[in-house]
Amino acid sequence: NLFAKKMEYKSAFTNEANESFELISIDDGTLRYFVTNNATGATLIKTSDLYSGGAAGFALSGDCTILGIWDAGRVRLEHQEFGTRITQRDNAPTNNNHATHVVGTMVASGVNNAAKGMSHQASLWASEWNNDSAEMANAAIDGLEVSQHSYGYVTGWHFGNWSGQSAWHWFGDPYIADNEDYNFGFYGESAQEWDILAYNAPDYLISSSAGNDRGNGPSP
């Protein structure tokens, strides 16, 4: 059957577009993968206006601030842009390009000025995305005030090599529909956990991506 066929899918891999995927759970027979998301936020929000000499006149750098990130793997702590400001809080075994990229967007010091992060003198706590909700709660208790989560569940159609060949794969519930996935915007268990966490830790801000899924799918 379809579920048995999907049980042969890979549990974790990176596709041709450098997106990282990992099987997180199985929900009513549907495989639920996390996928990394990218954005051009630093350019769009004009962070440089807040720097010393910037148009806003604030001279902000992120100094004395701790930020958090959860992502697909270990941050490359040895990167020239990070110095000693990054702490990997878990035992993530393998460096991940996406995690390192997002941390660079957040806190790269500007050794290469084109790579300068939005909070270029901030410190950062990094964790891999498994067990994120519990780790976030503990980090909030430890005083973390802001964290970035540039990932989400695979929904609808996605192109990749889950089944051994690079092709479009359907991750909606085929018993409900084969061309429309109710999980887009669905207020599920994970979203509820994060809402409860945010309510119980009012000084902790969770920043999460909305995904890159719009328009995905094979030609009609």
Question: What label would you give each PLM region?
Answer:
Residues 7, 17-18, 79, 188-191:
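Short, structured coil/loop segments at alpha-helix boundaries
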Residues 189-200:
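Catalytic-core regions built around general acid/base machinery
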Residues 186, 215-220:
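Conserved N-terminal glycine/acidic-rich loop preference
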Residues 156-189:
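A solvent-exposed, charged loop/short amphipathic helix patch at secondary-structure junctions
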Residues 30, 36-167, 199-205, 209, ...:
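Subtilisin-like serine protease catalytic core
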Residues 1-43, 50-52:
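N-terminal zymogen propeptides
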Residues 1-4, 138, 145-146, 151, ...:
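Solvent-exposed, charged interface segments at domain starts and junctions
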